[in-house]
Amino acid sequence: MAEKKGSSSEKNLYCTFCGKSQHEVKKLIAGPSVFICDECIDLCNEIIRDEQPSTEAKDGRGDLPTPAEIKANLDNYVIGQDLPKRTLAVAVYNHYKRLRHKDKAGKDEIELAKSNILLIGPTGSGKTLLAQTLARMLNVPFVMADATTLTEAGYVGEDVENIIQKLLQSCEYDVERAQRGIVYIDEIDKISRKSDNPSITRDVSGEGVQQALLKLIEGTMASVPPQGGRKHPNQDFLQIDTTNILFICGGAFAGLEKVIENRTEASGIGFGATVKSKKQRSISEVFQEIEPEDLIKFGIIPELVGRMPVVTALAELGEDALVQILTEPKNALVKQYSKLLAMEGVELEIRPAALKAIARKALARKTGARGLRSILEQSLIGTMYELPNADNVEKVVVDESTIEDGKAPLLVYREAAKKA
């Protein structure tokens, strides 16, 4: 009943859905012989919003961007690394195209295998940023795991199933969405086999973890506790199929270049061999000649190498690339610090010579793009401490001496600026 008569002969209107009277709610909207309150409308909107991601995931999330569009988006955030970006764009495009094909395919259709990706490159070259940018663009659940924290089941440390649990948490335990997500496993080179010879002690954080990752990467049903953990022993685990999860593994693989050089040099012996000095070739150039056998010799087990067919090497970043990273990307460091100072009503100017000095310092530290923030932070820390209490500061100027000699940045005051 939408209407009920009270003792005072006046009509009271009630929500048809929850039964609350017009006096208990803010608004009651009338339809043909029905009424709905504002609270029920809000609840309906929440239900529709919650169901939308699952529907989009099942449908393949609308239009799939082409490899060129994926690369163009990566260009906004990652400087250089053209070949890895192209390789990643094609691999990701083919992966999600494969999922669409799988949804529509009949029993007699050709099955398309999954191509997981291995990124090799020095620290600070953009491996993690590439994976994060991809996941953000495709609007799929993304999780980043550190291989160094993983151990075999039964030992202190994280089990490999914890990776899938984190993926579920990132999409609020929506199983359908999680099964189409992206997992980035960093520092994969740190779990390499410790030696070729079998040892009496167990290698619980090396080869043991690689064995545990095998099935997860290839595709298996992983058992994950439900949200909030199991409340009682009879509560079922969530079953997650990892077949359609794209795994991207990354690592610096320090020392792998020596393995590659030993193999390539061994092929040319005697008077006919071409002699090329090691100093003439950069690490990234050597990595271009990588073969699966090199990874196996490094300590990655053959089964795991076979499950990562797409291997791409990131180049070392030079001075020019580091200067571009400081200024050009969407979230460039200079833009970030300019925004921070703009909140104090102060403009930030970093001169070209200072940018080059920052790049040179990062190169000397051998930390890649990751070292840029600490250098810039170090040069501005004193100024950022004083600025909130300083009056009439219009501009902060960072020049070469600020970076190289540790001098304080130049402060331009409003009165001086007007006179100039």
From Swiss-Prot:
Domain ClpX-type ZB positions: 3-56
SUPFAM superfamilies: Glucocorticoid receptor-like (DNA-binding domain), P-loop containing nucleoside triphosphate hydrolases
GO CC annotations, alphabetized: HslUV protease complex
Residues that, per the record, bind Zn(2+): 15, 18, 37, 40
Residues that, per the record, bind ATP: 122-129
GO biological process assignments: cell division; proteolysis involved in protein catabolic process
Top-level division of the source organism's lineage: Bacteria
A Pfam family of this chain: AAA_2
InterPro entries reported in the protein's UniProt record: AAA+_ATPase, ATP-dep_Clp_protease_ClpX, ATPase_AAA_core, Clp_ATPase_C, Clp_protease_ATP-bd_su_ClpX, ClpX_bact, P-loop_NTPase, Znf_CppX_C4
GO MF annotations, alphabetized: ATP binding; ATP hydrolysis activity; ATP-dependent protein folding chaperone; protein dimerization activity; unfolded protein binding; zinc ion binding
Record's keyword terms, sorted: ATP-binding, Chaperone, Metal-binding, Nucleotide-binding, Zinc
Gene3D superfamilies tied to this protein: 1.10.8.60, ClpX chaperone, C4-type zinc finger domain (6.20.220.10), P-loop containing nucleotide triphosphate hydrolases (3.40.50.300)
Subunit note: Component of the ClpX-ClpP complex. Forms a hexameric ring that, in the presence of ATP, binds to fourteen ClpP subunits assembled into a disk-like structure with a central cavity, resembling the structure of eukaryotic proteasomes.
Function according to Swiss-Prot or TrEMBL: ATP-dependent specificity component of the Clp protease. It directs the protease to specific substrates. Can perform chaperone functions in the absence of ClpP.
Family: Belongs to the ClpX chaperone family.
NCBIfam families per record: clpX (TIGR00382), PRK05342.1 (NF003745)
Name assigned to this protein: ATP-dependent Clp protease ATP-binding subunit ClpX
Organism: Delftia acidovorans (strain DSM 14801 / SPH-1)
